[in-house]
Design a protein with these regions (language model features):
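Non-catalytic, polymerase-adjacent accessory regions of viral genome-replication enzymes
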Residues: 1-110, 114
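Generic detection of long, well-ordered alpha-helical segments
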Residues: 38-49, 124, 128-131, 168, ...
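Hydrophobic, Leu/Ile/Phe/Ala-enriched alpha-helical segments that form helix-helix packing faces
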Residues: 48-59, 63, 137-142, 182, ...
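Charged, glycine/proline-rich intrinsically disordered loops and linkers
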Residues: 86-111, 159-177, 239-257
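Catalytic micro-motifs at enzyme active sites that drive phosphoryl/nucleotidyl and oxygen chemistry
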Residues: 105-109, 117-123, 176-187
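Conserved pre-motif C helix in the palm subdomain of viral-like polymerases
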Residues: 114-151, 200-203, 258-283
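Active-site-proximal segment of RNA-dependent polymerases
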Residues: 131, 135-207
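Conserved polymerase palm-domain catalytic core
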Residues: 182-283
């Protein structure tokens, strides 16, 4: 693992802009980050490169102040969940009428059911840059050294144009590998079952302290320098501040009564790597 924090501001700016381009959930952050800049893409890139340089210096000089950075959680629409009562009504015998996420926008219709949200990180640009640097310096090494080829989601990209491997590529690789395994079983006259499912709300069921201890042990074993240790501490300070938000606390309490349950902020680059490390034993 890197002993220090080597950052190429041009490459990193390009990667961040690629993530912003293809993930529409960053639209709230875009206005906050670049609303005071000219719409010219070159000026935005120059501004981003300058901020990357500033954040890198602040990390190395122990001047990065998470507490003075803006961090919030913004709810983004996920789906409308209809109640069991609503689903069991006689008028809902038709399967098409039972579809939870199809909404008819007519004046006589009321939306019955609970609106569900995913909470997304809204922050200063410095927080996003901090996360991008963490992925480049620490996350990449964790991805390469700790995760097997059987893990497909949220893998750190090997190229210079994006932070993570595009979702559609990762899904295609997962699908192809799964069907290849099934084909092999059939050719060998064996029986197998292919189960495809989601880990519901896995980002919302995290023991952050346990995860932090695990990452620190890996960094210590790699004998990284003080700057890398400090970078990791800053990232976990961001996680702490996010989970201290009243909105997030109330949301976690609503989900579960477990004392140590916390959230990895969706939209924070390190979360994508950390969730894979956290679920490593499950994989």
């Amino acid at each position: 693992m890197n002993k220090d924090i080597p950052v190429n501001k041009k490459y990193l700016a390009n990667k961040i802009l690629t993530e912003l381009r293809y993930n529409k959930r960053y639209m709230y952050n875009w206005v906050r980050w670049f609303g005071n800049t000219d719409k010219d893409s070159l000026k935005i890139r120059e501004y981003l490169e300058a901020e990357i340089e500033n954040v890198n210096y602040e990390i190395k000089d122990s001047r990065f102040d998470v507490e003075n950075c803006f961090i919030d959680a913004v709810p983004l629409f996920k789906k409308i969940s209809r109640s069991e009562h609503g689903l069991n009504k006689k008028n809902d015998d038709n399967p098409r009428k039972q579809e939870k996420n199809v909404i008819s926008f007519t004046s006589e219709n009321k939306i019955n059911g609970e609106i569900e949200y995913n909470y997304f990180l809204l922050s200063d640009l410095k927080i996003m840059i901090l996360g991008a640097i963490w992925v480049e310096v620490i996350g990449r090494e964790l991805d390469n050294g700790q995760l097997s080829n059987d893990v497909y989601a949220n893998r750190v990209s090997e190229n210079t144009s994006s932070i993570f491997k595009p979702y559609f590529e990762a899904y295609s690789d997962f699908r192809d590998a799964s069907f290849k395994e099934v084909k092999t079983l059939i050719e060998n006259n064996r029986t197998g079952i292919l189960v495809q499912t989601d880990l519901s709300k896995c980002f919302y069921s995290i023991n952050i302290k346990e995860l932090e201890d695990k990452i620190k042990k890996l960094l210590t074993a790699s004998e990284v320098g003080e700057n890398v240790i400090r970078l990791n501490d800053y990232v976990f300070s961001v996680l702490g501040k996010y989970n201290d938000l009243q909105t997030v606390k109330e949301y976690v309490e609503k989900l579960s009564s477990q004392k140590d349950q916390k959230i990895l902020p969706i939209g924070f680059f390190p979360s994508n790597v950390l969730i894979n490390i956290y679920l490593k034993e499950l994989d």
